[in-house]
Swiss-Prot record:
Subcellular location: Cytoplasmic vesicle, Secretory vesicle membrane; Cytoplasmic vesicle, Secretory vesicle, Synaptic vesicle membrane
Known glycosylation sites: N58, N87, N104
Organism: Mus musculus (Mouse)
Keyword Membrane assigned: yes
Name assigned to this protein: Chromaffin granule amine transporter
Residue intervals on the Lumenal, vesicle side: 43-135, 186-194, 248-253, 317-332, 384-394, 441-445
Catalytic activity as recorded in UniProt: serotonin(in) + 2 H(+)(out) = serotonin(out) + 2 H(+)(in); (R)-noradrenaline(in) + 2 H(+)(out) = (R)-noradrenaline(out) + 2 H(+)(in); dopamine(in) + 2 H(+)(out) = dopamine(out) + 2 H(+)(in)
Cytoplasmic topological segments: 1-21, 156-164, 216-224, 277-296, 358-362, 416-419, 468-521
Entry comment describing in which tissues the protein is expressed: Detected in adrenal medulla, and brain (at protein level). In brain, specifically found in the medulla oblongata, pons, prefrontal cortex, striatum, dentate gyrus and hippocampus (at protein level).
Effect of loss of the gene: Increased apoptosis and reduced neurogenesis in the hippocampus. Spatial memory formation is mildly impaired.
Keywords annotated in UniProt: Cytoplasmic vesicle, Glycoprotein, Membrane, Neurotransmitter transport, Synapse, Transmembrane, Transmembrane helix, Transport
């Protein structure tokens, strides 16, 4: 009896290492953490840099007024200051970050009601905000740029050594990046933390998606598992920005990042318990070369759709909060909540179409999704307040959910159909496409907005999505590799063969004793 009790934890660990569902949980949590950290900085960084740097710029002016003026500013009669972001008044002693007093050397009239102040007061510091578009865009894009550089090495690496080690390396780097965000007080340190996040995200995303594709070999089950895993991505996008804005407003800058660091520790402990290094067979190291996959036109079409659809929301991350600050006089907490409809709709879209796309046709879902992305982006500049952003942002999130949940399984399907069923490289390509969108979007958006304005930027990226959408028709019936050769030699008709998995019974790649029979579930 005593031996049975002592052996129970070992038995549970052994069963857990052979469970596909726990692997799905690990990938879900990893994507959740990555995307919470991705979006939690969206409302924090613009306000934090404004509070620190713009305040420092104006502090030199504070020393300019005469002694009598300074005394008058501290007197009870003139102890109120106007916030040009949320049209509220407060005492100078109750100054919090992101509130800037009128310090031009003259005494402003007492403000008693927000409605009595002209609306153009919310445009104070507009030159600084326009300059911040570029710097914040580069900061946000640095994560995707670094991820873009690392992905081509991570994909083949997972084919060689398996998925456990890259997943755990990704966890450690993400944990370090989260701590750096918590305690960084300058733009340079924030930039380093963001680039570190890109490295960790590359390891976690490529290894996680490749792991799911290896474990779930059935096309229907794979689509469902990918939809659930992308739900973790969606949930991270859902709670990241609102969570960051609320915690920054009422607790402080470090608090959301410390909570995410604790979540990273939980994910690392879960990985350490249930994931073990793969027993890599010689055939698993003979996957299709990355360059060969990049020459496949069908993989390129799918990757282009992923890139352009996600570029739409990537452009909004640095530009929408600043546009709201300039045109809507929005307070800090609204800057994060503006992304809430998109995140909720993305969560619904990924889970709904992870199952429906297999019945409707994944190519059709991706085509409709890209058109919807374009239309939603065209409607964003029409909003005059945060309530006007609900519809366009919700449509954008739902449409991107359609595209991602449809095209991620297609990437694995194309490798099974046209190449060798080793998935590290193809999901590295998918992640590269995602990263290109999140690299080009914020960086170019931050540069273009001061030149042509935010509305025209939305028109351009929305139109590009609509124009690209018809290319998804090529994904309807992609030919198998043997069919392609036969078609070129005119030796067989062009009908598409029925899709069959090359290795229908694939051993669980992460089990400690993969030779032992047992249930996968």
């Amino acid at each position: 009896m005593f031996q049975v009790v002592l052996g129970a934890p070992q038995r549970l660990l052994k069963e857990g290492r052979q469970s596909r569902k726990l692997v799905l949980v690990v990938v879900f949590v990893a994507l959740l953490l990555d995307n919470m950290l991705l979006t939690v900085v969206v409302p924090i960084v613009p306000t934090f840099l404004y509070a620190t740097e713009f305040k420092d710029i104006n502090s030199s002016l504070l020393r300019g007024p005469s002694v009598s003026s300074q005394q008058a500013l501290t007197s009870p009669a003139f102890s109120t200051t106007f916030s040009f972001f949320d049209n509220t008044t407060m005492t100078v002693e109750e100054h919090v970050p992101f509130r800037v007093a009128w310090i031009n050397g003259t005494i402003p009239p007492p403000v008693t009601e927000a409605g009595s102040v002209p609306k153009n007061n919310c445009l104070q510091g507009i030159e600084f905000l326009e300059e911040e578009n570029v710097r914040i865009g580069i900061l946000f894009a640095s994560k995707a740029l670094m991820q873009l550089l690392v992905n081509p090495f991570v994909g083949p690496l997972t084919n060689r050594i398996g998925y456990h080690i890259p997943m755990f390396v990704g966890f450690m780097i993400m944990f370090l990046s989260t701590l750096m965000f918590a305690f960084s007080g300058t733009y340079a340190l924030l930039f380093v933390a963001r680039t570190l996040q890109g490295i960790g995200s590359s390891f976690s995303s490529v290894a996680g998606l490749g792991m799911l594709a290896s474990v779930y070999t059935d096309n229907y089950e794979r689509g469902r598992a990918m939809g659930i895993a992308l739900g973790g991505l969606a949930l991270g996008l859902l709670v990241g920005a609102p969570f960051g804005s609320v915690m920054y407003e009422f607790v402080g800058k470090s608090s959301p990042f410390l909570i995410l660091a604790f979540l990273a520790l939980l994910d690392g402990a879960l990985q350490f318990c249930i994931l073990w290094p793969s027993k890599v067979s010689p055939e698993s190291a003979m996957g299709t070369p990355l360059l060969t996959l990049l020459k496949d036109p069908y993989i390129l079409v799918a990757a282009g759709s992923i890139c352009l659809a996600n570029m739409g929301v990537a452009i909004l991350e640095p530009t929408l909060p600043i546009w709201m600050m300039q045109t809507m006089c929005s307070p800090e907490w609204q800057l994060g909540l503006a992304f809430l409809p998109a995140s909720v709709a993305y969560l619904i879209g990924t889970n709904l179409f992870g199952v429906l796309a297999n019945k409707m046709g994944r190519w059709l879902c991706s085509l409709v999704g890209m058109v919807a992305v374009g239309i939603s982006l065209l409607c964003v500049p029409l909003a005059h307040n945060i309530f006007g952003l609900i519809g366009p942002n919700a449509g954008l999130g739902f449409a991107i959910g359609m595209v991602d949940s449809s095209l991620m399984p297609i990437m694995g399907y194309l490798v099974d159909l046209r190449h060798t069923s080793v998935y590290g490289s193809v999901y590295a390509i998918a992640d590269v496409a995602f990263c290109v969108g999140f690299a080009i979007g914020p960086s170019t958006g931050g540069v273009i907005v001061p030149v042509i304005g935010f509305p025209w930027l939305m028109v351009i990226i929305g139109t590009i999505n609509i124009i690209y959408a018809p290319l998804c028709c090529f994904l309807q019936n992609p030919p198998a590799k043997e069919e392609e050769l036969a078609i070129l030699n005119q030796e067989c008709p062009t009908e598409t063969q029925m899709y069959t998995i090359q290795r229908p019974t694939k051993e669980f790649p992460l089990g400690e004793n993969s030779d032992d029979p047992g249930s996968e579930e």
